[in-house]
Amino acid sequence: MKRNILSVLIALASIGTACAQETQFLSNNHCLYRIQQKDKCLLLPVQESAEMSNIKVIAGNKQMKSLNVRLAMNKVDYYVPFYLDEFNEEKTLALDIHVNGNYRNDGGISTFTCWKNIKTAESFDTTNHEQYRPLYHHTPAYGWMNDPNGMFFNDGVWHLYFQHNPYGSQWENMTWGHSTSTDLIHWTFQGDPVQPDAWGAIFSGSSVVDKNNTAGFGENAIVALYTSAGENQTQSMAYSTDNGKTFTKYDGNPIITSNVPDFRDPHMFWNENIKKWNMILAAGQQMNIYSSDNLKDWKFESSFGAEYGSHGGVWECPDLMKMKVRGTDKEKWMLVCNINPGGPSGGSATQYFVGDFDGHKFTCESKPEVTKWMDYGKDHYATVTFDNAPNGRHVALAWMSNWQYANQVPTMQYRSANSIPRDLGLFEYKGNTYCSVTPSEEITAARSKKPSKSLSEACEMVVNLKGDATITLSNSKGEKVVMTYKAKDETFSMDRTLSGKTDFSSDFAAITTAPVYGKMNKLRIFIDKSSIEVFDNDGKMAMTNLVFPTRPYDKVTIKGKTKKYAVYKLK
């Protein structure tokens, strides 16, 4: 089946016109590829096990672009588009291609199969050919995706930018991809508006709606800050006057520099308390906090975290927000810190700290040794929130994968999905304050009107609890996921060791366990082909795990004091 799907993908992507081209082989690992025909895109054949090729795009004796692609050596796994219409004013393009490795013994790169299969076309087919692509989660149309970036809401539209590799389904060529949605469920890919430049690849960052034109780019301009990943990591700015469709990079980039090696992922927000912008930025094993009047000139205020929380890996992708504590008149601040590795089940995870922030310094209310995790699954990372979300909501998305195996999961046309949207809040339990995580109202609105007892490959399952329970999802192949709630111990666990395909990484098969702060009365379980996300109905527990069953789970077995459940298809 896998071979047939792959064959169809290759055949569809190959529909096009053979290029009017000239290939000049200069050495065993170096060639020039000249393109005279100007269709919309050049279809590049990719083989994931091949060595990386660096391609310099040259026109009129000027280097226009540089990218890295695993050009097919002896088989074609899939195609990616290189859009020629970026260079409409140029009659001829030359691709200066240098392949890593030494190929003297096998005839050199002139024997690569890519030269027989490369061609131009007027369009690139993004029809899904993947068994595991989810139905109600955001995924890239093609290529690799990791961190969500620059998210904002404006004029009824949710804008999601994301770390995107347009030239392969493994990490490389970091660019900001862009998708939009009116309901947080159905997404439309809008292209790659922020691309690498002389300062480096485009790493993670944030966007804000500048309602009062503080930056001088226009009222309601979209202002983005991102990390330029060059020889050193620096922070750069871009702005949009067409509601995020296109961006202009600021002439004064980079606007923030440092000699700290891991210096990245700026997240900014308007702080009404001080009438200024604040920004939080990962700097090694701590978070730096800045303030600004105009989004261009930033003043360092303080650092947080050197002695707090988990330090098993790199700190990155921060967020900082003020929220009400459920059932009280209190307001507190929550600082989000994503860490890799060092998560509770290994690899990537999202930790958080609750406390106070005066616009200058964050003060954590917990002891330094206390670590709080937002989600206890293995596949919840790079969690950040949308700017300008309606009604004061804090709507978050995460990258649904783990750096332990993200490049190896069994998909090729695309890699990675985002979590379902989640609303964040705060609640108290036994004198401590924790983050509540609940599925956003938009996902509930997507339910079918009538529930059933039959599982589908894309559904929500609601289970009423009256105490201990074991819930098993299984299929005819004997593949299963076992979820266990122990009321007395206040724990919930998920066992995916027999869930389906697990052999692509020794780190994948796992049992994940979460604390539950109080009694659970209802579970909400979201299944979408290759993922299972579980929430306590009141937001006291969240767990996100990928699964790759060879057939969809179609059987539910519940043991315990309750057997009441309902299944809603999601549309």
Task: Mark where each language-model region is.
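Hydrophobic core segments of beta-strands in well-ordered, beta-rich domains
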Residues: 44, 93-97, 147-167, 189-193, ...
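Non-cytosolic beta-sandwich-type ligand-binding/adhesion modules
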Residues: 48-84, 89, 94-100, 175-182, ...
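Surface loop/turn signatures of beta-propeller and other carbohydrate-active proteins
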Residues: 23-28, 32, 63-82, 111-149, ...
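Beta-propeller blade signature
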Residues: 177-181, 236-243, 291-293, 348-359, ...
